[in-house]
Amino acid sequence: MPEFLEDPSVLTKDKLKSELVANNVTLPAGEQRKDVYVQLYLQHLTARNRPPLAAGANSKGPPDFSSDEEREPTPVLGSGASVGRGRGAVGRKATKKTDKPRLEDKDDLDVTELSNEELLDQLVRYGVNPGPIVGTTRKLYEKKLLKLREQGTESRSSTPLPTVSSSAENTRQNGSNDSDRYSDNDEGKKKEHKKVKSARDCVPFSELASTPSGAFFQGISFPEISTRPPLGRTELQAAKKVQTTKRDPPRETCTDTALPGKGQTHKLAPGRSLFIPSESSYDRCVEKSSSPSSQREFAARLVSAAASPSLIRETTTTYSKDIVENICRGGKSRAQPLRAEEPGVSDQSVFSSEREVLQESERSQVISPPLAQAIRDYVNSLLVQGGVGSLPGTSDSVPTLDVENICKRLSQSSYQDSESLSPPRKVPRLSEKPARGGDSGSCVAFQNTPGSEHRSSFAKSVVSHSLTTLGVEVSKPPPQHDKIEASEPSFPLHESILKVVEEEWQQIDRQLPSVACRYPVSSIEAARILSVPKVDDEILGFISEATPRAATQASSTESCDKHLDLALCRSYEAAASALQIAAHTAFVAKSLQADISQAAQIINSDPSDAQQALRILNRTYDAASYLCDAAFDEVRMSACAMGSSTMGRRYLWLKDCKISPASKNKLTVAPFKGGTLFGGEVHKVIKKRGNKQ
């Protein structure tokens, strides 16, 4: 009778399967974990080494001994080839230096010598759902592990045989057990922390749109992150302590009056306000984040989270802690205006309490998922740039936001309380005519209105943020005469835009491309607004009556007038196409703003639901790609309108010129390069005409 191993775990998975098949043991369907085959080996093969009534069939050592020295299998003489190979495997396994010892066999384990992964594994074995183990939380978890080991609540029973009826369960469990550490394949030799990291790898969305035309943006992929597990006992206690430590409810912070538009509705109906300001409770927590350094910080945190989600776990709390501690050390006197309404509470006590809240939050890791935190900060900065401010649910969110509110409130110490009480300035409607101011003209008077100053400040803020995000440096123009003007932030004409303009100006008489397929509108609006207006019948009647009397008019003049009319019609068509594109981009941009607001609300209300927010951000990426392509189409239509108007002006100026019709046609359709109406072609024509004379 062949004798089998008492500890079959030393065999590889393939060897176990071959031994089971050789001894007529039915294997479960599909690929199973190694523990499954070990249990089958113990039940069907190892049990044959003993009488049927022998106890401890599934034990890993002889039944008569319980000491650790007798856990190794006893050599058996006279075994066959297969048993000899098994003993050879045992010998090789005993001398292998890369195998990790079984932590559960060590009763006198020193928790201080464990790595973060081993400490996490031990806590999981005791049924604890720990959070991230970093330098600030390791001592807490070491004490918890020692306490649990003293209570002796760890279950030392053998791994139960899982059911193999559900293929989905087998797929979920395959590759996630600890038996990979004891196998001889290459995957089993890898360290355990690599398996933990594989669950957090960045997986880009497959549905992301391609890179937009113009090479403005690079492809962006949002990683998929797993849902954060429920808070553990220590985290819940820390969260309760944070809530009880708060001494006052969150107050409305000072709003940035330089940024306009705290409204929520845009109305496109004629005669109504295009932007309606409103006073709501959502206008909170607006931080002054338009500086290049702060925007670069948000973008860097988002990129680092996408590249390595585990890195942001430590940098998030460190980032907030450094801001608060720097302000607490040097900004006591600066923050006094914000605390003026509470004379009974000293600034030092407030700062100390806020420091305790921040340190307790850092120790207990009461933070939202790293990627959600970075996305939320970045989206909030974009919303601040757009004048939306904070979103609903910000003040009633998780305690993590209290830390951010501390940073925002302390960083806004340069503002005055009176600014937050001032009503929003009224943005003038498009239908309103500005007051005339002396000889400066209506345009200058309109620019001096308070609303236009807000819009100009808003435009400067958006342009500065966009330039910083794209990494574009604005060159300062040289001072003109004795007047030194501050350089205004502005977008340069990118080479891709100039290329589109040059292509259209090379042949200004070409047929306009149709945009009806990509930007469709209703037939009624197309006929009334987008189509070139027809000449009234009454005017045509007058012209027909005057034609016989003008029969002596030169045919060249009539041809010039017709070409001029055609050029003006082409200009109208190009402008109508640009209007058609702009109407579509307006609605898509409004939808994009709503999607970003919805994603920010989801992240603020439930940070663990990052998947839904990422799906919304995926839609916003598609919308942004659409806007980029539409912008280039609008640039093309604008270039066509400029070329057509230039051709019309050429016909008008050449109408009475005494040159040949062929020369006129050549000059009117010559490529346009800007600067002068005819460019260098006029010199060639004049030179030829002089040579003929």
UniProtKB/Swiss-Prot annotation:
Phosphothreonine PTM positions: T74, T153, T159, T163
Coiled coil: 557-656
Pfam families, per the entry: LAP2alpha, LEM, Thymopoietin
Lineage: Eukaryota, Metazoa, Chordata, Craniata, Vertebrata
Domain LEM: 108-152
Subcellular location as annotated: Nucleus; Chromosome
Annotated stretches, region: Linker: 49-107
Domain LEM-like stretches: 5-48
Molecular-function GO terms, alphabetical: DNA binding; identical protein binding
Domain notes: The N-terminal part contains two structurally independent, non-interacting domains: LEM-like (also called LAP2-N or LEM-D) and LEM (also called LAP2-C or LEM-B). LEM-like binds DNA while LEM interacts with BANF1.
One GO CC term on file: nuclear envelope
Chain positions with N6-acetyllysine modification: K655
Motif (Nuclear localization signal): 190-196
Basic and acidic residues bias locations: 96-105, 178-190, 245-254
Known function: May be involved in the structural organization of the nucleus and in the post-mitotic nuclear assembly. Plays an important role, together with LMNA, in the nuclear anchorage of RB1.
Protein's recorded name: Lamina-associated polypeptide 2, isoforms alpha/zeta
Modification after translation: Phosphorylated in a mitose-specific manner.
Compositional bias annotation for Low complexity: 412-422
